[in-house]
């Protein structure tokens, strides 16, 4: 089984990924693949460079570029695990790449929605190098994600979590969701 986790930046995707990992299931982060590719190209890890590489990869390899780069990692992990989680799928082309590469696998899409203001505050607090510090940067990043096609992936989700309450409430919802998905093994 492949579990694709999607949502806008700062929505709470990593909580879902971490819950699967706590239960012994590995994950592949498409964002990490872009960051690795940025370093391979001799560029410093800045939000500008990561964004440029993300766009350049799609120009060079197609809209599903990052998924193509992840397929072999996912394949290797599936040899040792019943479930592999893929974090950060941003387009239906990427979903299609995984469906095409793994036709025998049950592929489940989990989306997380969090209101924009909450996401902005979380991203500012998170402090990763590519996190926006101004509302304008935040909106620009959101539009970039939407242009990649993330809205289509969210719309096609098998499960949708709304993360607009307390941390404890969301963590309880995540555990419940992971329990439900694992019960289908």
Swiss-Prot record:
Keywords: ATP-binding, Nucleotide-binding. It comes from the Archaea. GO terms for molecular function: ATP binding. The keyword Ligase does not apply. ATP binds at residues 7-14. Pfam families: AAA_17 (PF13207). Belongs to the UPF0200 family. This is UPF0200 protein TK1334.
């Amino acid at each position: 089984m492949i579990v694709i986790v999607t949502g806008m930046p700062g929505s709470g995707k990593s909580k879902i990924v971490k819950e699967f990992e706590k239960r012994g299931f590995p994950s592949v982060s498409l964002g990490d693949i872009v960051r690795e590719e940025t370093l391979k190209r001799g560029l410093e890890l800045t939000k500008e460079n990561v964004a440029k590489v993300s766009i350049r990869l799609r120009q060079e390899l197609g809209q599903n570029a990052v998924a193509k780069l992840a397929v072999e990692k996912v394949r290797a992990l599936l040899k040792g695990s019943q479930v592999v989680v893929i974090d950060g799928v941003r387009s239906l082309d990427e979903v299609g790449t995984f469906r095409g590469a793994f036709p025998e696998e049950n592929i489940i899409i989990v989306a997380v929605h969090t209101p924009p203001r909450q996401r902005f505050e979380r991203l500012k607090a998170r402090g990763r190098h590519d996190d926006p510090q101004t509302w304008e940067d935040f909106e620009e990043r959101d539009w970039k994600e939407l242009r990649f096609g993330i809205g289509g992936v969210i719309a096609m989700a098998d499960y949708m979590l709304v993360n607009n309450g307390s941390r404890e409430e969301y963590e309880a919802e995540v555990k419940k969701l992971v329990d439900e998905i694992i019960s289908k093994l």
